A protein has these predicted regions:
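Conserved non-cysteine loop/helix-boundary elements of the Radical SAM core domain that shape
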Residues: 1-90, 94-113
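Auxiliary Fe-S-binding modules of radical SAM enzymes
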Residues: 97, 104-232
């Protein structure tokens, strides 16, 4: 409310993050989040009106959630023009209500591959709207490593998502080209490893799709941009 924001302003706070988690009221209710999508919208607008930097957090794989609902959540968060976003896939820890739901079959945890595919789409959506995703996936360590039971947890989750983006872009462009010749695929210099994929999985996927490619760096390309030429 206004009173609390005034206090934060007086203490020279510059940024505020809200744990929206979802913008679907049914999902919020099922997961007992204690707020509605309208609450997030109202709070976000009030925070921005005071000049604070606004950060929003969303989760994937919550009870009652779907990929379509997550995409809608991202669209509604984008409409609020946050400065930053964090995206966290849901994981299940031992000795939690979610662990009980998992065991009795009322909840199915999101798989790693499902989360990577979805979060790759979300990452591009926010980027296309000039919103920085400052965190994608949980940090490793602590209670997560000790109590992990199920869900999309990987210490290099963001790298997997970015690798997925590059693979889909490469396959999309290569599908327009003949398979009977080798190609050079240029990617941003800093993203060579992501484009090749962990354990070179993307290179293997290209080969499995009938394309012989070399992946090289180009310092003039922007994130997720690629350039394909014949390997003469």
């Amino acid at each position: 409310d206004d009173e609390r924001l005034e206090i934060l302003k007086n203490y020279h706070v510059t940024s505020i993050e809200l744990g929206a988690q979802s913008m679907d009221d049914d999902v919020l209710k099922i997961n007992r989040r204690g707020h509605t999508a309208k609450d997030v919208e109202n709070a976000s607008r009030l925070i921005k009106s005071y000049g604070f930097s606004l950060g929003l957090q969303m989760m994937t794989g919550l009870m009652g959630d779907t990929d379509e609902k997550c995409i809608k959540t991202a669209e509604r968060l984008i409409a609020l023009s946050p400065d930053t976003v964090r995206i966290y896939p849901t994981i299940v820890l031992e000795n939690t209500p979610l662990a009980d739901y998992l065991r009795d079959g009322s909840y199915r945890a999101e798989t790693l591959n499902e989360a990577v595919s979805l979060c790759a789409r979300l990452l591009l959506m926010f980027r296309e709207n000039n919103i920085k995703v400052i965190r994608l996936g949980l940090h490793s360590g602590g209670n997560v490593d000790e109590g992990y039971l199920a869900g999309a947890y990987h210490p290099a989750f963001r790298e997997l998502c970015e690798g997925k983006i590059y693979l889909e872009k490469m396959l999309s462009e290569l599908s327009k080209l003949p398979k009977d010749m080798p190609y050079v695929i240029e990617v941003p210099e800093k993203s060579i490893g992501k484009a090749k994929g962990q354990n070179k999985r993307n290179e293997k996927a290209l080969l499995n799709n009938g394309f012989q490619c070399k992946i090289k760096g180009n310092e003039f390309l922007n994130d997720y941009d690629i350039k394909i030429t014949e390997d003469i």
